[in-house]
């Protein structure tokens, strides 16, 4: 029996969703990109998963370790087989100025692949129910939990303070 994917084609055909728009707005704020990329490079944290945890926290939904592990399973194959190879290819071209045009095209494909990854997480969000609807700060809780799961650690302080601060800001 073939296991059905946790998303359907309709979800993937509509990657411009609330989560994607949140990510574009938040990621562009001061310090957020550097913070997220540092967590990715030093600790293997998936930036889209980190943004997902912050976004779902804006809806007062708190995630537990099992929720984050389930979300990770939704995207791990796509991230490993598509997003990361594109990222590696783009980074390899950085040193060669003659590759600037090709590098720009690869970067555009990488962003599209990340948008599809976010569409998978967005579709998954409908299945998540808050583990603790009364948690004081769902954004900080979820972001810290995401980093803790990725690093197999327990964090007592905010792992990504710029992201948490940016996610708390209302749309302008």
Regions found by a protein language model. Give the residues of each.
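Residue-level detector of well-ordered alpha-helical segments, enriched
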Residues: 35, 45-51, 82-85, 102-105, ...
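Long, acidic, intrinsically disordered low-complexity segments
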Residues: 1-12, 129
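A charged, amphipathic interaction segment
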Residues: 91-170
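N-terminal interaction modules that seed assembly of large macromolecular complexes
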Residues: 32-69
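Short alpha-helix boundary/capping elements
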Residues: 44-48, 56-61, 79, 111-117, ...
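Acidic, glycine/proline-rich low-complexity segments that act as flexible tails and inter-domain linkers
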Residues: 2-3, 15-30, 167-172
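Short secondary-structure subsegments characteristic of cysteine-rich extracellular domains
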Residues: 63-85
